[in-house]
Amino acid sequence: MQTNKRLKMASCVKAAAMLGMLLSVSISTTAQADSWRGWNIHPPSYPNGKALESFAKEVAEKTEGRVEPKVYHNAVLGDQPDAIEQTRSGALDFANFNMGPMGPIVPAANVLSLPFIFKSPDDMYRIMDGEIGERFADALAEKNLIVLSWFGSGARSLYNTDHPVETPDDVEGLKVRVMNNDLYVQMIDEMGGNATPMAYGEVYQSLKTGVIDGAENNYPSYESSGHYEVANYYSLTEHLILPECLCVAKASWEELSEKDRQAIREAAEDAAKEQRALWEEGVQASKQKILDAGVKINEVDDKSAFQAKMQPIYDQFVQEHPELESLVTDIQDAQS
C-alpha cells in the first residue's frame, strides 16, 4: 500500500511539473508576441490605408510573429492631435501623421507649411529621404516619435471659376477659400486675392453661387468633392506639398531587438514606396476624370514669381523663428 501511494504521489508530482512547464512555455510565447496598435486617419481603401495594411503584414512576417501590428483606420482612436500624444506616450505603437499639424509639438515642422517651400512632389520626396529629412526625424525623436519613412499627401493647387492662374497677378481680386491657417490666408493676400477661410463642406455651394471664386486642393480632393463641376480652371501652382511620416512610439521601439528594428524599417520603406505609387495612380485617375469633364488644366512652369510674392511671409517667419532660418535656406538651396 505504501509503495502504491508513493507511486501515485510521484506521478502527481511529475504531472504537476509537466503542467508547469507547459504553462511556462505558453506564457513565454504570449509575452514574446507584441500586439501593436496603429492609428490612421484615412479609410482602409485610401493609399495610406492600403500601405499601412501591407506594413502590418510584412512586419508580422519578418519578425516571425514577435510583433503583430493592427491598423485602426478612420481615426477611430482619436483625431490627429490626440493620436500624436498617445503615440508619444506609448499608448499607441505606430501611426501615419501629416506633418502640417505637427508644428505645436515640433516647431521645425512649421517650415514644411511655408507656401512654395517645395517646388514639386519629387523634390519633396528627394529632400525628405535625405539628410534634411533626417533632421526632421531627429527633432521628432526628441519628442518620442521614431520616423521610419515618409509618405506623400499630394500637391495643393489653385482652382477657380473664371480663368487660368499663370502668374500671381491672376489671383488678384479672386475670393479664394483656404484652410484656417494664417500662413495660407497671408499667401492669398500677398497675391492680391481675398482669402476666405471656410468649412470644407461649404465650398461646393459657395463656388456654385459665387460666394467665392476659387479654392485650392490636390487632384484627388478636387475631383472627389465635385468642385471641378463648378470651378473648371485648375492651375498647377503646387503651392503646398506636405510630407507625412510613418512613426513608431519610442517606448515600443526601445523594446525591440536590433534584428526586429531592421525588419520593421525595411517594411516601412516598402510601405512608403507603395503609398507613393498608389497616390500617383489616384492622381492620374482623378486627372483623367476631370479632363474628360472638360476642366482646363494649366501648368505653372515658372514658380519664381509666386515664390517672390511669398517673401514677406518668409521674412516674418524667420523673424519669429530665427533658429529655423538655416533649415529654410537649406531646403531652398537643395532645389536651386
From Swiss-Prot:
Source taxon at top rank: Bacteria
A molecular function (GO) term: carbohydrate binding
Keyword rRNA processing assigned: no
Concerning InterPro entries, the annotation shows:
DctP_fam, TRAP_DctP, TRAP_DctP_sf
- Gene Ontology cellular-component annotations: outer membrane-bounded periplasmic space
The signal peptide stretch is 1-33
Main site of residence? periplasm
Q: Which GO terms describe its biological process?
A: transmembrane transport
This protein's UniProt keywords: Periplasm, Signal, Sugar transport, Transport
**Keyword field contains Signal:** yes
User: What compartments host this protein?
Assistant: Periplasm
Q: Which Pfam families match?
A: DctP
Disulfide connectivity for this sequence is none
Q: Where does beta-D-glucuronate bind?
A: H42, Q80, R156, R177, Y200, N217, N218, E244
* Similarity field: Belongs to the bacterial solute-binding protein 7 family.
Q: What is the annotated quaternary arrangement, including any partners? A: The complex is comprised of an extracytoplasmic solute-binding protein and a heteromeric permease formed by two transmembrane proteins.
What function does this protein fulfil?
Solute-binding protein that binds D-glucuronate (in vitro). Probably part of a tripartite ATP-independent periplasmic (TRAP) transport system that mediates solute transport into the cytoplasm.
NCBIfam families named among the record's database cross-references: dctP, TRAP_S1
Q: Which PANTHER family match?
A: DICARBOXYLATE-BINDING PERIPLASMIC PROTEIN, PTHR33376
Query: What name is this protein filed under?
Result: Solute-binding protein Csal_2479
- Organism (species): Chromohalobacter salexigens (strain ATCC BAA-138 / DSM 3043 / CIP 106854 / NCIMB 13768 / 1H11)
Instruction: Give the gene symbol.
Output: dctP
